[in-house]
UniProtKB/Swiss-Prot annotation:
Name this protein carries in UniProt: Acetate kinase
Assembly with partners or alone: Homodimer.
Cited InterPro entries: Ac/propionate_kinase, Aliphatic_acid_kin_short-chain, Aliphatic_acid_kinase_CS, ATPase_NBD
Gene from which the chain derives: ackA
Native source species: Halalkalibacterium halodurans (strain ATCC BAA-125 / DSM 18197 / FERM 7344 / JCM 9153 / C-125)
GO-annotated molecular function: acetate kinase activity; ATP binding; magnesium ion binding
């Protein structure tokens, strides 16, 4: 079972392994807010119920009860492992790990690096431990895949002591997604991943680019936090750090308020002035809205900077991968990103680029650099690691 616990939500998928076959999936929302929503897929149909879900432990008990009452499983003994998504593993965890009390303590020590996410992930881990104490549980970290980055990639040009004393460095995120699509790309290309130089573009409301050389992440666009890198739905991506005191002075905001603006009111929303949803922006740009068009241009130009930079880092590229909500579904963004990359050996086919939400090659056969659309599947990656470590 793959689990993604948020502060007031719990997403779950039950998979048959090693077939990687989805049995059911669902989400528990509004935990602790008085009007909980429980949604589960039963025989391909969504079943939604509304009732008070006071805490995560209650959510877990309800989930396990529903799995048996809907006859999705006959007995809880069928659950052989639980994989938990954990956002931040810092430098402590460079791979997924079997959860012990020491591991939970290690995750807690990373809380200051991800104050919104890690505590919620721990609550999910503890809730399952309470209800299914004998089922092996595995922590799968968003940051672990990027722990192969060399120091020259992850270090900021700050006093070196800041890194040693406070752990200030680039960590990178979306690692589970980048790992999944890079492995899948190698399968689709029919080549050993050790021989491939891949550019993975995880483009969703949060977005990051990763340079993957020989199956290892050597650089990625997000940084110490997921605020860095390319323009995103509501996040600014990279800005000049001296802007923070300047904005404070001009607007009267505190430092935390400015960070909140950079996280929640910037990006596509900030530039367009009306939406963080790329579908709305594409529609408005098509109707001649200049700010919407500008938002698309800014979004694309930031992605180009990373593609060029990472191609140079790897001395070339064998394939470019598009994944996540925008990468998998936006023909417009893929076209804008790929347009002008012929100098790198990227020749893409506009008719093949019409694909949405499924695996496909969208390059011409003669293109030296292949271009793939691969729907990400972080849950399968979590399940694979759970099987690997729980046996």
């Amino acid at each position: 079972m793959a689990i993604n616990a948020g502060s007031s939500s719990l997403k779950f998928q039950l998979l048959n392994m090693p077939e990687e076959e989805l049995v059911t999936k669902g989400v528990v929302e509004r935990i602790g807010l008085g009007d909980g929503i429980f949604t589960i897929e039963v025989k391909g149909e969504k079943v939604t119920e509304t009732f008070d879900i006071p805490d995560h432990a209650f959510a877990v008990k309800t989930l396990l009860e529903k799995l048996t009452s809907h006859e999705i499983i006959q007995s809880l003994d069928e659950i052989e492992g639980i994989g938990h998504r954990v956002v931040h593993g810092g430098e402590k965890f460079n791979d997924s790990v079997l959860i012990t009390d020491e591991v939970i303590q290690g995750i807690e020590e990373c809380n200051e690096l991800a104050p919104l996410h890690n505590p919620a992930n721990i609550v999910g881990i503890r809730a399952f431990k309470e209800v299914l104490p004998n089922v092996p549980a595995v922590a799968v970290f968003d940051t672990a895949f990027h722990q192969t980055m060399p120091e020259s990639s992850f270090l900021y040009s700050l006093p070196y002591d800041y890194y040693k004393e406070f752990g200030i460095r680039k960590y990178g995120f979306h690692g589970t997604s980048h790992k999944y699509v890079s492995q899948r790309a190698a399968e689709l290309l029919g080549r050993p991943i050790e021989q491939l130089r891949l550019l993975s573009c995880h483009l969703g409301n949060g977005a990051s680019i990763a340079a993957i050389d020989g199956g290892k992440s050597i650089d990625t666009s997000m940084g110490f936090t997921p605020l860095a890198g390319v323009t995103m739905g509501t996040r600014s991506g990279n800005i000049d750090p001296a802007l923070i005191p300047f904005i404070m002075e001009k607007t009267g905001q505190t430092a935390n308020e400015v960070i909140n603006t950079l996280n929640k009111k910037s990006g596509l929303l900030g530039v367009s002035g009306f939406s963080s949803d790329l579908r709305d922006i594409e529609e408005q740009a098509g109707e001649g809205n200049d700010r919407a068009e500008l938002a698309l241009e800014v979004f694309t130009s930031r992605i180009h900077k990373y593609i060029g930079s990472y191609a140079a880092r790897m001395s070339g590229v064998d394939a470019i991968i598009f994944t996540a909500g925008i990468g998998e579904n936006s023909t417009v963004i893929r076209e804008r990103v790929l347009r002008g990359l012929e100098f790198m050996g990227v020749y893409w086919d506009p008719s093949l680029n019409q694909v949405r939400g499924k695996e496909a090659f969208i390059n011409y056969p003669h293109s030296p650099v292949k271009v793939l659309v691969i729907p990400t599947n972080e849950e399968v990656m979590i399940a694979r690691d759970t099987v690997r470590l729980a046996q």
